[in-house]
Amino acid sequence: MRYIRSIYIFCSIVTSVRSGASELPEERELTTNFSSMSLTKVPEGLTPITTTLDLSYNLLFQLQHSDFRSLSKLKVLILCHNRIQELDIKTFEFNKELSYLDVSNNRLKSVTWFSLAGLRHLDLSFNDFDTLPISVETGNMSHLETLGLSGAKIQKSDFQKIAHLQLNTVLLGLRTLSHYEEGSLPILNTTRLHIVLPVNTNFWVLLHDGIKTSKILEVINIDLQKSQFTSYESQQIPILENAKTSILLLNKVDLSWDDLFLIFQLVWHTSVEYFQIQHVTFGGKVYLDHNSFDYSNTVMRTIKLEHVHFRIFNIPQESIYLLFTKMDIENLTISDAQMPHMLFPMYPTRFQYLNFANNILTDDVFKKSIQLPHLKTLILKDNKLETLSLVSHFASNTSLRHLDLSENLLQHENDENCLWPETLVTMNLSFNKFADSVFGCLPRNIQILDLNSNKIQTVPKAITHLTSLRELNLAFNFLTDLPGCSHFRRLLVLNVEMNLILSSSLDFFQSCQEVKTLNAGRNPFRCTCELRDFIQLGKYSEGMMVGWSDSYICEYPLNLKGTQLKDVHLPEISCNTGLLIVTIVVVMLVLGMAVAFCCLHFDLPWYLRMLHQWTQTWLRVRKTTQEQLKRSVQFHVFISYSEHDSAWVKYELIPSLEKEDGSVLICLHEGNSDPGKSMTEDTINCIEKSYKSIFVLSPSFVQTEWCHYEPYFAHHNLFHESLDYIILILLEPIPLYCIPTRYPELKALMEKKAYLEWPKDRRKCGLFWANLRAALHVNLLDTRGTCELQTFTELNEGFGGSAISLIRTDCL
């Protein structure tokens, strides 16, 4: 009861207070709530600017004239659910703006009236009045819209005092009803009549009069366990004249099946177009012949029977089913009734809307021919249906536009044929057991399709093109990729929330250009390059992605887990293979051009060759063993050169070699011979006593005949040890073809042996000398202490003017 009262109070405040509040849009509203505080009197010191005061659910038993005197701005006063026994309306004489007064659910027995011209809502229901608390002052409240009354006796004379008022709602909240004068209710002038009945009330008379009273009639708490219609069992149900009600609502009804049958028969011949019964329980023995129901002469369009509970009764269910389906009206709802089956007459009916939700209907309901040519909406939600193709064959004989088959056990096999009407545009197939094969059993002209919470893994490519589809809901399935729109070219809304989508497909971006709304949140996204276009879509398409960006979070890779997609940065170059290749090619071309420029401008190849030679020499020196040093040598190096290059040898080569510590022993050509020895013997002796031999190569060296013998001697003398003991210095370029064929040794050396090239650029000389010193880096076994440099020169005129100079340091 408290729940009903709360709804009623809320609705009344919305209609009464807000309609008056618009007159003072600039004034500040203040609500003070003292409800459920066990107060025994109205609190003192209330703020004068209070506009709404709630004192409900307390222990107030008396109101003083001074309680609300200071609240000149008060508009809403709620005093329901207290213990007030007497009410003097004059208590509110200083509350000129009061428009809403609720004193329901108290213990009121009397009211002292005072004119409150501004009152719009007055509720005195559920009190202990002996008669209805209505006076002449009540009739003077010209702005009154909602009036709540209660009383043990209801008489015509009471309502006549307010018959001239045009009321919106009248509430009769009755605790007891000992007397009702028939014909009293029709005196009221109200749009809506709301009656809450006490136990053991003559419901029949109130229903009879209520239908004549208001456009909307709602009756609550109908308890007819013992039928009150027994006096009519052998009589014809009277036809009501002057009926006004077009909407009849019965709530919390407990009655026998015969009572329900008679209520329907009574209402059937009235002005009622919409008849709703909620929370109904019926059963018991059946006495009336239900085949005698008179279906003629009615304006009924809609019947709703919701939340039905059965007591044990002895009646064939077929009679119940046919009682409703033979009514042949536009709209019929029987929901939450635990109904296992439904029968239809053999002839065509004019039903346009059928709602059998929340029952236990099975496929058997479609196994008999059903003729519903005008049916446009069918709701079979939350039943036990299993075969989609069976439903399709039933629907093919209708004009169905909207079909709800959600929360069933439906499946579809590929070998089952489906036949849908061309008119079907909306289908709800959610919460079933459909797999991918369901796409082979869809109506061609479907526009809105809901397949959420099924077992769909992919959208098959070999399906019928649904060219009219506008909205597709695939949420809570098992998709691993965003589906493409190749078969849904006009798709505008796509929902794939809560699937197993890791990345977006290329087909989606190529074929879903028309999609305006996409919900793909709460999927385990793999934030790699495959998802880059999808991330860009979310960032730059305003309002398209539902739930962006809180519902779009990376699941893989692990280093990005928990990161929102909007915070993931995937560079274009790392995801675009073509761009990456072009970039690499461009970079390589730039580097190649830079290297070429350096080679031309800085002679880089020469530096590289010299660096390579120095490295090779350094490695060879490190590999040199003490066994290789046991050779009996007195000089570090023997220098062979032509007379033409002597200036370079004396002023460049020798000073650079001696520059380090002066301990280098050099044997070189100078022009004097050693007495007693031939030039050949002296040359061989110098080569044998020198650890390494340097040959300064130039065109003049090649033209000197003696210079070819010196490489020959050195080559053959050191060949058994290593070519590493021969050092070639190319002072000037010498093409190999310029070397005469009669001197193969020099050509062989130049082909096999890497040589040091003297740079023309003086800035490169440092690297040249470093390479040369590295090549000469070895300690003589018998060199100790301080040595004195001696020079030996030999001249041999018979060999073209070449010279051998021995520069030696003797040990002290």
UniProtKB/Swiss-Prot annotation:
Record topological domains on the Extracellular side: 20-577
Q: Which residues lie on this side of the membrane: Cytoplasmic?
A: 599-812
The protein's recorded glycosylation sites are N33, N140, N189, N331, N397, N428
Q: What are the protein's GO molecular function terms?
A: identical protein binding; lipopeptide binding; NAD+ nucleosidase activity, cyclic ADP-ribose generating; signaling receptor activity; Toll-like receptor 2 binding; transmembrane signaling receptor activity
Localization per Swiss-Prot or TrEMBL? Membrane
Task: Give UniProt keywords alphabetically.
Answer: Glycoprotein, Immunity, Inflammatory response, Innate immunity, Leucine-rich repeat, Membrane, NAD, Receptor, Repeat, Signal, Transmembrane, Transmembrane helix
Q: Which domain of life is it from?
A: Eukaryota
Domain LRRCT positions:
523-577
Where the LRR repeats fall, as residue ranges, is: 24-46, 49-70, 73-94, 97-118, 119-139, 143-166, 296-321, 325-348, 350-373, 374-395, 399-420, 423-443, 445-467, 468-489, 490-510
Enumerate the Gene3D superfamilies for this protein. Answer: Ribonuclease Inhibitor, Toll/interleukin-1 receptor homology (TIR) domain
GO BP terms: namely: cellular response to bacterial lipopeptide; inflammatory response; innate immune response; toll-like receptor signaling pathway
Endoplasmic reticulum in keyword set: no
Mode of membrane association: Single-pass type I membrane protein
Q: What is its main location?
A: membrane
Q: In this protein, which residues make up the domain named TIR?
A: 633-776
Provide the transmembrane region boundaries.
578-598
Xref: InterPro entries: Cys-rich_flank_reg_C, Leu-rich_rpt, Leu-rich_rpt_4, Leu-rich_rpt_typical-subtyp, LRR_dom_sf, TIR_dom, Toll-like_receptor, Toll_tir_struct_dom_sf
Q: Which residues form the signal peptide?
A: 1-19
Which GO CC terms are listed, alphabetically? plasma membrane; receptor complex
Family label: Belongs to the Toll-like receptor family.
Per UniProt, subunit arrangement is: Binds MYD88 via their respective TIR domains.
Q: What does this protein do?
A: Participates in the innate immune response to microbial agents. Acts via MYD88 and TRAF6, leading to NF-kappa-B activation, cytokine secretion and the inflammatory response.
- What PANTHER family is this protein classified in? TOLL-LIKE RECEPTOR (PTHR24365), TOLL-LIKE RECEPTOR 10 (PTHR24365:SF23)
Q: What is the protein's name according to its record?
A: Toll-like receptor 10
